[in-house]
C-alpha cells in the first residue's frame, strides 16, 4: 500500500510539473526540462519501435529527441498534443491505422501467394507438355524404324547377274519429329503468360517491400491528423460544445458552489440525463457510448470479411491445385502396343509386336502449391486482438482525452462547465410540471433532507480525514 501511495504521489508531482507552465526559477526550470526530456525519450523510443524505418540510425533518433525536448519545453500545445497522440492510438485514429496495416498484410501476402500458385500451375503444365512431346513421338518413331528395318531384313536380295554385278545395299532411315514446333509454340505461349505473371509478381514484391513503410506512415499520419482536429475543435470558437457530455470533478464542484449560493443546481442527474451524460470516471458505457462502440467495430467487421474473402480465394486455389496434383499422381500410365500385321494368301498374321508405357503426368512436373497461413494470420490475429481491446477501452480513452485537455486548458474547461450547466438547466425548465414534482418528491425522500445533522457529521468527518492526510 505504501509503494502504491508513493508511486501515485510521484506521478501526480510529475504530472503537475508537466502540465503547469514553466516557472522562472532555476530549480523549477530544471524539473520542467527533466520531465519534458523523459516524455520526449519515451515518445521517440516508442516511435522507433513502431516504425524502425522512420528512425533508422542513432543520429536521427537523437536529433528527433532533441527537437521534441525543445518543443515540449517551449510549447504547452506540444505537451498536450503528444499525450493526446498516445491516447488517440487507442481510438478511431489508431483503429484506422491498424486496419490499414492488416489490409496490407492480407493483400500483399495472399495476392502474392495466388500469383505464385498460378505460376507453379503454368510451369507444371508446360513441363508436362514438353515431356509428353518427347515421350510420345520418339518411342513411336523408334518402334516404327525398328519395324521398317525388320521388314528390310526379311526382303530377299536380287540374285540376277550375281556373277556380273555385286549389290551392296543399305537402308538409311532419317528421324524427323515435329516436337520442335510444339516446343516453339510452348515457349511463345509460356513467355506471354509469364511476362504478365512476372510483371504482376514484381509489382507485388515492390508493393510488399514498400507497403509496410507506406502503411505505417499513413497510420501515423492518420493519428497525427485526428489529434490535430480534436485539439482544433476543443480549442475552437465553439469548443465548449464539442464532446461536452462528461460530468467531471470540476463540474461537481461548480454545481456544489451553485448550491451553496442558493442558485439552481443540476445534480443529481435524472434517469434520462444519466443515459446521455457520462459521470467521470465510469467503466459502464452509456447507451450513446454503446452505439459508438458498435460504430467502432463496424469497419473492423467489414475489413475482416474482406480479409477472409482474400484468404478463402487463396485457400480454394491451393486446394484445387493440390487435389489435381494428387489425382495426377494416382493416375496409372498408358501401355501402347504396336503390332505389325502381314497378309499372306488371304490370311493376316502378327509378324511383329512391341509395346511401351507412357505416364499421364510426369512426376517432376507436378505443381506444388503453397498456403502460408501462419505468415499472414498470426500478425492479423494480434491486430484483431488489439482492435478488440481498443474498442472495449475506447470510452475510457475518450474520457482521458477530455481530462488531459481540461488539465492543459482550464479556461476552456470552465467555459465548457458553464455551458453544460446552463444547458441542463434550460432543458429542465422546459420539462412538464409533473416531472419536476416527481423529482422533488424523490429528493424529499432522501434521509439528509429530514436529518441534516447526519449530513453535517459526515462532512465534518471528511474534513477531519482530509486534514489528517495533509
Curated annotation (Swiss-Prot):
Subunit structure: Monomer. Homodimer. Isoform 1 interacts (via the C-terminus cytoplasmic tail) with OS9 isoform 1 (via the C-terminus tail); the interaction induces DCSTAMP redistribution to the endoplasmic reticulum-Golgi intermediate compartment. Isoform 1 interacts (via the C-terminus cytoplasmic tail) with OS9 isoform 2 (via the C-terminus tail). Interacts with CREB3.
Entry keywords, A to Z: Cell membrane, Differentiation, Endoplasmic reticulum, Endosome, Immunity, Membrane, Transmembrane, Transmembrane helix
Extracellular face of the membrane: 56-57, 119-209, 314-376
One CC-aspect GO term: membrane
Coiled-coil positions: none
InterPro entries (alphabetical): CSR-E3_Ligase_Protein, DC_STAMP-like
Name used for this protein in its record: Dendritic cell-specific transmembrane protein
Role description: Probable cell surface receptor that plays several roles in cellular fusion, cell differentiation, bone and immune homeostasis. Plays a role in TNFSF11-mediated osteoclastogenesis. Cooperates with OCSTAMP in modulating cell-cell fusion in both osteoclasts and foreign body giant cells (FBGCs). Participates in osteoclast bone resorption. Involved in inducing the expression of tartrate-resistant acid phosphatase in osteoclast precursors. Plays a role in haematopoietic stem cell differentiation of bone marrow cells toward the myeloid lineage. Inhibits the development of neutrophilic granulocytes.
Tissue-by-tissue expression: Preferentially expressed by dendritic cells (DCs). Detected in both immature and mature DCs. Highly expressed in lymph nodes, lung, kidney and liver. Expressed at lower levels in pancreas, bone marrow, spleen, leukocytes, in freshly isolated peripheral blood mononuclear cells (PBMC) and B-cells. Not expressed in freshly isolated monocytes.
Residue spans crossing the bilayer: 35-55, 58-78, 98-118, 210-230, 293-313, 377-397
Domain of life: Eukaryota
Entry domain remark: Several domains are necessary for interacting with OS9. The region in the cytoplasmic tail that is necessary for interaction with OS9, is also required for its transport.
Record localization: Cell membrane; Endoplasmic reticulum membrane; Endoplasmic reticulum-Golgi intermediate compartment membrane; Endosome
Main localization, broad class: membrane
Induction of synthesis: Expression is down-regulated by dexamethasone and up-regulated by IL4/interleukin-4 in macrophages. Down-regulated in CD40L-activated dendritic cells.
Gene Ontology BP annotations: cellular response to interleukin-4; cellular response to macrophage colony-stimulating factor stimulus; cellular response to tumor necrosis factor; membrane fusion; myeloid dendritic cell differentiation; negative regulation of cell growth; osteoclast differentiation; osteoclast fusion
Amino acid at each position: 500500500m505504501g509503494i502504491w501511495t508513493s508511486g501515485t504521489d510521484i506521478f501526480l508531482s510529475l504530472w503537475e510539473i508537466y502540465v503547469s507552465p514553466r516557472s522562472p526559477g532555476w530549480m523549477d526550470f530544471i524539473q520542467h526540462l527533466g520531465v519534458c526530456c523523459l516524455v520526449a525519450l519515451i515518445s521517440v523510443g516508442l516511435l522507433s519501435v513502431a516504425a524502425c524505418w522512420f528512425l533508422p540510425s542513432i543520429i536521427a533518433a537523437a536529433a528527433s529527441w532533441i527537437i521534441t525536448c525543445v518543443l515540449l519545453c517551449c510549447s504547452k500545445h506540444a505537451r498536450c498534443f503528444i499525450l493526446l497522440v498516445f491516447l488517440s492510438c487507442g481510438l478511431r485514429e489508431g483503429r484506422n491505422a491498424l486496419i490499414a496495416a492488416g489490409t496490407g498484410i492480407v493483400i500483399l501476402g495472399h495476392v502474392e501467394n495466388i500469383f505464385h500458385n498460378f505460376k507453379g500451375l503454368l510451369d507444371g503444365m508446360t513441363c508436362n507438355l514438353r515431356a509428353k512431346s518427347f515421350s510420345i513421338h520418339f518411342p513411336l518413331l523408334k518402334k516404327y524404324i525398328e519395324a521398317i528395318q525388320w521388314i528390310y531384313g526379311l526382303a530377299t536380295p536380287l540374285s540376277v547377274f550375281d556373277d556380273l554385278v555385286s549389290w551392296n545395299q543399305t537402308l538409311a532411315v532419317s528421324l524427323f519429329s515435329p516436337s520442335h514446333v510444339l516446343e516453339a509454340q510452348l515457349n511463345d505461349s509460356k513467355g506471354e503468360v509469364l511476362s504478365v505473371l512476372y510483371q504482376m509478381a514484381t509489382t507485388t514484391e515492390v508493393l510488399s517491400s514498400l507497403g509496410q513503410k507506406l502503411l505505417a506512415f499513413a497510420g501515423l499520419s492518420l493519428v497525427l491528423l485526428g489529434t490535430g482536429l480534436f485539439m482544433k475543435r476543443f480549442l475552437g470558437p465553439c469548443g465548449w460544445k464539442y464532446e461536452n457530455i462528461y460530468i467531471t470533478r470540476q463540474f461537481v464542484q461548480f454545481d456544489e458552489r451553485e448550491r451553496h449560493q442558493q442558485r439552481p443546481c443540476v445534480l443529481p442527474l435524472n434517469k434520462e440525463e444519466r443515459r446521455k451524460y457520462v459521470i467521470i470516471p465510469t467503466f459502464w458505457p452509456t447507451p450513446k457510448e454503446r452505439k459508438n462502440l458498435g460504430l467502432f467495430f463496424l469497419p473492423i467487421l467489414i475489413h475482416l470479411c474482406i480479409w477472409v474473402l482474400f484468404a478463402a480465394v487463396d485457400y480454394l486455389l491451393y486446394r484445387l491445385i493440390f487435389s489435381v496434383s494428387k489425382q495426377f499422381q494416382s493416375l496409372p500410365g498408358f501401355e501402347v502396343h504396336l503390332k505389325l500385321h502381314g497378309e499372306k494368301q488371304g490370311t493376316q498374321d502378327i509378324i511383329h509386336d512391341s509395346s511401351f508405357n507412357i505416364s499421364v503426368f510426369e512426376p517432376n512436373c507436378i505443381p506444388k502449391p503453397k498456403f502460408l497461413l501462419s505468415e499472414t494470420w498470426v500478425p492479423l490475429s494480434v491486430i484483431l486482438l488489439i482492435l478488440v481491446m481498443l474498442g472495449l477501452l475506447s470510452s475510457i480513452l475518450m474520457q482521458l482525452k477530455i481530462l488531459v485537455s481540461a488539465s492543459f486548458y482550464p479556461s476552456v474547461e470552465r467555459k465548457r462547465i458553464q455551458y453544460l450547466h446552463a444547458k441542463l438547466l434550460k432543458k429542465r425548465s422546459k420539462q412538464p410540471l409533473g416531472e419536476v414534482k416527481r423529482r422533488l418528491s424523490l429528493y424529499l425522500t432522501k434521509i439528509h433532507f429530514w436529518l441534516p445533522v447526519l449530513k453535517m457529521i459526515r462532512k465534518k468527518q471528511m474534513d477531519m480525514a482530509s486534514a489528517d492526510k495533509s
